Structures are given as C-alpha cells and as structure tokens.
Curated annotation (Swiss-Prot):
One of its GO terms (cellular component) is cytosol. HAMAP family: DEAD_helicase_RhlB (MF_00661). Residues 40-219 form the Helicase ATP-binding domain. It comes from the Bacteria. This is ATP-dependent RNA helicase RhlB. Residues 406-418 have a biased composition (Low complexity). GO terms for molecular function: ATP binding; ATP hydrolysis activity; RNA binding; RNA helicase activity. GO terms for biological process: RNA catabolic process. DEAD-box RNA helicase involved in RNA degradation. Has RNA-dependent ATPase activity and unwinds double-stranded RNA. It catalyses: ATP + H2O = ADP + phosphate + H(+). The gene is rhlB.
Length: 434
C-alpha cells in the first residue's frame, strides 16, 4: 500500500489480540486504511456497524480482523456442537467468497481458528468434508450455505459474528430472501456482533440493517469523487462497425500490462474474446457459465500475469481483488450507473494510477447521461481517426459447444468447453516515456 491510501492509525494501537496482530504483520499490514481506522474501534467495542465503502478500500481486512478478534475474546457458546460455526461471512459471488478466504489465510494460521468455504459451482463432497470436521468461521454464498443447513450439515444456533459483504449487490442479485432465511435462524441480534458493508447505504440496505442488527453505527468512507482521482477516464463514440477495430487499435497503442474489458452480455464477451484470441493476445474469458475450476484458473493466470487481458461480464466487477490492473475498457456502457463505478474501480487501487476507456456506441450511448449524473462529472471525450484503425484483422475464434449427447446427466452443465486458450502474442518494444 502507498502512503496515500493509509492513515496514521496503527493496528498495534487498537487493542487487537496478539495473534490477530501477528496475522496482520505477516502480510505487512501496519497502518489502517480509512475504513479500517473508523470501523475497528467501533467493532472492538462490541458495537454493530453498517459500513459504506467501495471495493478496494480495505473493508475486507476490517471485518476479518474484527471477526477473528471477537472469537478469540468471546467464549464459545456452552454445549456448542461440531456442526455449529461461530461466525458466518456471506458474499454475493463465489469469487468474492474465495477472495475473502484467501485474505483470511494469515489470520487462520496465526490464530488457529478453522475456516471453510461454501459456494456453488463446486461439488458438495469436498466442501462437506471440511465442514464436517468442524469450523469456527464459514465463508460463502447464501445458496450453498442454505443447502448445507437443509441437509443438516450445519446450523446457526451458535453464531456469534455475522458479516454481510456487498449488501447492495445481494439485493441486485435477488438474494435478499436467502439472507433473511439465514438471519432468522440465528441467535438474536443482541447476542452476536453484526457487520454489514455496502458500496451504498440505500434505503433497502438500511432497512435490512435495522431489521437484523442491534442499533448499528453507520461508518461511511466516501472517496473525493466516486470514480477515484487516480483514474484517468476517456470516452469514445464509435459506430457499431468501428467498435471492435477501435478496441483492438487502442490495445495496440496502449498495450496495457493488465486489462479488463467489460461487456454487457455473455454473447458480447465471447465475441470480444474471439477477436482478441484470433489476434494472438493472451486473453481469458470470465462469464457466468464458465465452470468454477476454470474461473479460478483464469483469475490465477490473470493475477500472475500469464494472461494480459480478461474479458468479463459484471460478474467480475464486484469484490475481486486483482492488483495492478492498469486499464479497464467499457466495451459496452453498463445499464446501471453504479456498475460504471464498480467496473472502473478495478484499476487505480491502493494508491496506483489507472486508465478507464469507455465506448458510447449506438446501442448503449443512451446510458451515458445517467452515468455522468451519478459520478457528478462529464467523462472527457476523445475522437479517433477512422483511417488509423487496424485493418485486415483475423476472423474471430468461435467458441464451440460439445455435442448434445456429451452434455447429458449434468456432466458439464451445458458449459462451453473451449476458450481461454493461452496465446503468446509478442509485445512490441515500449517507447521511452515522455
């Protein structure tokens, strides 16, 4: 982290348990970010919070430190059974759940507390084996958590800490009934520490907090501007005929170290991926129907730099912590203004600068006024020279489906099997920076 992203508040001065501090120190976390500096004193005093902070502000570490600290300082309920976790952390997507677990690993090692994951897209047996051995902290998505509950693998009667991350996204994805199902099977709000985090504390999010929390304190950390002052924004108005050529031309000009391209539909993502893969870029595809193991592999390759470009739907826009993303391309302007902020928030994180390039095309330019109203500024517009666009580009690679007979009995849930091939397009030599 750079100094611009942290405060003078040190974790060591907050009164955290030594084992928790050891876990933080192991990852090099010494000073707090603003959300950590505001939230942790409240949580360590035993007060519930409803926190407003965007992804990339350090909120995950705030609720993890508070969760582990509370479990270390609070006796387990008398007569607690092996099927009863003491803390539950709910996330809207499996990628976010996995990321939270990964962020918790140093605290798991330093405290000796046991944690497990529960999310869809992976076979029950592997997750069930870990859960059956007994866990202190269960991290996952609501659907799979409820499945384990209904099978009698877990119950919520010994819950002492609850975390609801990306609460606004939970509403967007229609998970609110699942959330209430879980909450209503726990001890009363006064008997547990409750944390809710959301990019926006809308009326519906605050209503949820009022219903299932004990007089939560509102902790708000808002950036100077919604899109982050370290992100350079740029807007083009391409025709539909020029859109793909403009994208490939800009990639050739910018040659980003690590870029995410967002499109609004799975079909459009596959089309963009096909063009870039045919042009020998090292590109990965992340959409909702990519099998979980493949998703994890793609994200790992992208994080390690083995893949330079990730083409994604908004499934990747929230919660994923991928450091050093240099460019975000909005191939399609999102239909929801808030998603623009979440998308470009993949870059310009932790004090780093970033670039956002958006296309206001014939189909999605209608979304621009709402986006600019929401971010409270106009996106700087750039023109392009049609004669300078790349020509003679190869035909896109088409993703192929398995023959229908090979997809029976849920063998691959109808997922596309090709794609995400690793390409080795040589990078051009970088010109000296002016």
């Amino acid at each position: 982290m750079k100094k611009t992203h942290i405060t003078e508040q040190k974790f060591a001065d907050l009164g955290l348990e030594p084992q928790v501090l050891d876990g933080l120190n192991a990852k090099g976390f010494i000073n707090c970010t603003p959300i950590q500096a505001k939230a942790l004193p409240v949580l360590l005093a035993g007060q519930d919070i409803a926190g407003q902070a965007q992804t990339g502000t350090g909120k995950t570490l705030a609720f993890l430190a508070a969760t582990f600290n509370h479990l270390l300082t609070t006796p387990a309920p008398e007569g607690r059974k092996i099927t009863q976790p003491r803390a539950i952390i709910m996330a809207p997507t499996r990628e976010l759940a996995i990321q939270i677990y990964n962020d918790a690993e140093s605290l798991i090692a330093s405290t000796g507390l046991k944690a497990a994951l529960a999310y869809g897209g992976e076979r029950y047996e592997k997750q069930q084996k870990v859960i059956e051995a007994g866990v202190d902290i269960l991290i996952g998505t609501t659907g799979r958590i409820i499945d384990f509950y209904k099978q009698g693998q877990i119950d919520f009667k010994a819950i002492q800490v609850v975390v609801l991350d990306e609460a606004d996204r939970m509403f967007d994805l229609g998970f609110i009934k699942d959330i209430r199902f879980v909450f209503r099977r726990m001890p009363a709000p006064a008997e547990r520490l409750n944390m809710l985090f959301s990019a926006t504390l809308s009326y519906r999010v605050q209503e949820l907090a009022f219903e299932h929390m004990q007089e939560p304190e509102h902790v708000v950390v808002e950036p100077d501007q919604k899109t982050g002052h370290l992100i350079t924004e740029e807007l083009f108005y391409p025709s539909n005929d020029h859109k793909m050529a403009l994208l490939q031309t800009l990639i050739e000009e910018e040659w980003p170290d690590r870029a995410i391209i967002f499109a609004n539909t799975k079909h459009k993502c596959e089309l963009v991926w096909g063009h870039l893969a045919a042009d020998k870029h090292r590109v990965g595809l992340l959409t909702g129907d990519v099998p979980q193991k493949k998703r994890e592999r793609i994200l790992e390759e992208f994080t390690k730099g083995e893949v330079d470009i990730l083409v994604a739907t908004d499934v990747a826009a929230r919660g994923l912590h991928i450091p050093q993303v240099t460019h975000v391309f909005n191939f399609d302007l999102p239909n929801e203004a808030e998603d623009y902020v979440h998308r470009i928030g993949r870059t310009g994180r932790a004090g780093e600068s970033g670039n956002s390039i958006s296309f206001a095309c014939e189909e999605y330019a209608i979304n621009l006024p709402a986006i600019e109203e929401y971010i409270e500024h106009s996106i700087p517009q750039s023109d392009y020279d049609t004669s300078a666009l790349l020509e003679d580009l190869p035909a896109p690679i088409r993703l192929q489906r398995r023959p229908p007979q090979n997809r029976r009995n849920g063998s691959n849930n109808g997922q596309r099997q090709s794609g995400n091939r690793k390409h080795s397009r040589p990078r051009p030599p970088r010109s000296p920076q002016a």
